[in-house]
């Protein structure tokens, strides 16, 4: 099978679920923007990042 015919199923399903997870994505992006100038390194958006990927994972598993 030629390589151009190979489709990464994981990526396909994740991409198809991203529109259903817009709210957590926007929350993550807003957090990243908010802490962009933090020089201390103590602020992070880990919670928002995991909330977004939890939404995508939940959608993919259905």
Swiss-Prot record:
The UniProt record lists the keyword NADP: no
Membrane topology value: Peripheral membrane protein
Subcellular location: Mitochondrion inner membrane
Identification of the protein by name: Cytochrome b-c1 complex subunit 6-2, mitochondrial
Keyword Mitochondrion assigned: yes
Gene3D superfamilies recorded: Ubiquinol-cytochrome C reductase hinge domain (1.10.287.20)
Organism field: Arabidopsis thaliana (Mouse-ear cress)
Gene Ontology biological process terms, A to Z: mitochondrial electron transport, ubiquinol to cytochrome c
Self-association and partners: Component of the ubiquinol-cytochrome c oxidoreductase (cytochrome b-c1 complex, complex III, CIII), a multisubunit enzyme composed of 10 subunits. The complex is composed of 3 respiratory subunits cytochrome b (MT-CYB), cytochrome c1 (CYC1-1 or CYC1-2) and Rieske protein (UCR1-1 or UCR1-2), 2 core protein subunits MPPalpha1 (or MPPalpha2) and MPPB, and 5 low-molecular weight protein subunits QCR7-1 (or QCR7-2), UCRQ-1 (or UCRQ-2), QCR9, UCRY and probably QCR6-1 (or QCR6-2).
Function description: Component of the ubiquinol-cytochrome c oxidoreductase, a multisubunit transmembrane complex that is part of the mitochondrial electron transport chain which drives oxidative phosphorylation.
UniProt keyword list: Disulfide bond, Electron transport, Membrane, Mitochondrion, Mitochondrion inner membrane, Respiratory chain, Transport
């Amino acid at each position: 099978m030629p390589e151009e015919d190979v489709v990464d199923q994981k990526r396909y399903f994740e991409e198809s679920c991203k529109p259903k997870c817009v709210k957590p994505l926007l929350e993550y992006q807003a957090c990243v923007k908010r802490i962009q100038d933090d020089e201390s390194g103590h602020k992070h958006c880990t919670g928002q990042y995991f909330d977004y990927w939890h939404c995508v994972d939940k959608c993919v598993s259905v």
